[in-house]
């Protein structure tokens, strides 16, 4: 597998064709929808994130989304930032729930746990340690695996600002081995990822620039990773957030019921323990 990217396929025209939408998802493991979320709701969430960065002293008063830049993602208190972003208002807004239910074809439950991201441009560091290596969310989250990850940009993304890359159809091979990758760390702990040797030449990486209002949903066993923000001329912030969604009738595990700040506040735990709620001897 090489880091060359083809575009996501736009699935928006399939939203009203249940059979075609399910067929595409079963084959490719993702659904990319353009402009389906209320842009004003997304903008409000972006403004809340901006105000959080200002309140915590990482951006000057009067900074706008167009002028925002911060020195470091890692310097921001991630738990404190969650007090400023009312993401559940977006995830569970009636207009948003209609989108989720159209994708699933049934009533849904949106996880209480949300991840928020505010990455400044770092063109001299191609892979900052806080980025995630190739992995499957289903390795961490359970016990049921019928959830889908929903990833949205709060500001426009470009090939420079990066985003999330997915390996087309990789979900069909099921769960894969994840090994510790010392060059990727979260909360001071090494993060597990999938060895590159695990991938076949047919598992093409996909990435497309996205606009606020777009959403990418993918399978629990979709192999994916974060791409760095290396934007220049202009350098831009990447602001995004993601959660998981599952059928309302399914079992609800620890990550589904526990807000991220509750699981993240224990500094002694690495990412595996935080997501599962179960202490582990090795992350």
Swiss-Prot record:
Binding residues annotated for substrate, in chain numbering: 117, 186
Broad class of enzyme this protein falls into: oxidoreductase
EC number: 1.14.11.35
Disordered as annotated region, ranges: 251-283
BP terms from Gene Ontology: antibiotic biosynthetic process
Gene3D superfamilies per the UniProt record, alphabetical: q2cbj1_9rhob like domain
Domain of life assignment: Bacteria
Cofactors that this protein relies on: Fe cation; L-ascorbate
Residues that, per the record, bind 2-oxoglutarate: 135-137, 151, 226, 238
Keywords assigned: Antibiotic biosynthesis, Dioxygenase, Iron, Metal-binding, Oxidoreductase, Vitamin C
InterPro entries with a match to the protein in the record: DxPntBtaHylase (IPR054971), Phytyl_CoA_dOase-like (IPR008775)
A GO molecular-function descriptor: L-ascorbic acid binding
Entry-linked Pfam families: PhyH
Catalytic reactions on record: 1-deoxypentalenate + 2-oxoglutarate + O2 = 1-deoxy-11beta-hydroxypentalenate + succinate + CO2
Pathway annotation from the record: Antibiotic biosynthesis; pentalenolactone biosynthesis
Binding site for Fe cation: 135, 137, 224
Record NCBIfam families: DxPntBtaHylase
Family designation: Belongs to the PhyH family.
The protein's role, per its UniProt record: Catalyzes the conversion of 1-deoxypentalenic acid to 11-beta-hydroxy-1-deoxypentalenic acid in the biosynthesis of pentalenolactone antibiotic.
Protein name per UniProt: 1-deoxypentalenic acid 11-beta-hydroxylase
Organism: Streptomyces arenae
Gene: pntH
């Amino acid at each position: 597998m090489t880091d060359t990217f083809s575009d996501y396929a736009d699935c928006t025209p399939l939203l009203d064709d249940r059979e075609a939408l399910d067929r595409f998802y079963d084959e490719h493991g993702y659904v990319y929808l353009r402009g389906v979320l209320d842009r004003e709701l997304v903008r409000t969430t972006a403004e809340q994130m901006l105000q959080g960065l200002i309140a915590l002293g990482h951006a000057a008063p009067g900074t706008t989304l167009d002028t925002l830049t911060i020195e470091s993602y890692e310097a921001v208190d991630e738990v404190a930032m969650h007090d400023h972003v009312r993401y559940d208002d977006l995830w569970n807004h009636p207009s948003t729930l209609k989108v989720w239910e159209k994708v699933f074809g049934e009533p849904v439950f949106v996880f209480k746990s949300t991840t928020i991201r505010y990455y400044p441009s770092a063109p001299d560091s191609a892979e900052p340690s806080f980025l995630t290596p190739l992995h499957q969310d289903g390795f961490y989250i359970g016990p049921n695996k019928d959830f889908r990850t929903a990833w949205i940009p709060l500001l426009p993304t470009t090939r420079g600002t990066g985003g999330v890359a997915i390996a087309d159809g990789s979900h069909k091979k099921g769960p894969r081995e994840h090994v510790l990758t010392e060059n990727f760390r979260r909360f001071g702990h090494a993060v597990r990822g999938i060895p590159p040797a695990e991938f076949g030449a047919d598992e093409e990486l996909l990435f497309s620039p996205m606009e606020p209002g777009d959403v990418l949903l993918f399978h629990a066993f979709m192999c994916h990773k974060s791409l760095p923000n290396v934007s220049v001329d202009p350098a831009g912030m990447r602001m995004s957030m993601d959660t998981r969604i599952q059928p309302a009738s399914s079992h609800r595990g620890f990550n589904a019921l526990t807000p991220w700040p509750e699981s993240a506040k224990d500094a002694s735990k690495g990412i595996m323990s935080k997501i599962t709620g179960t202490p582990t001897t090795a992350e």
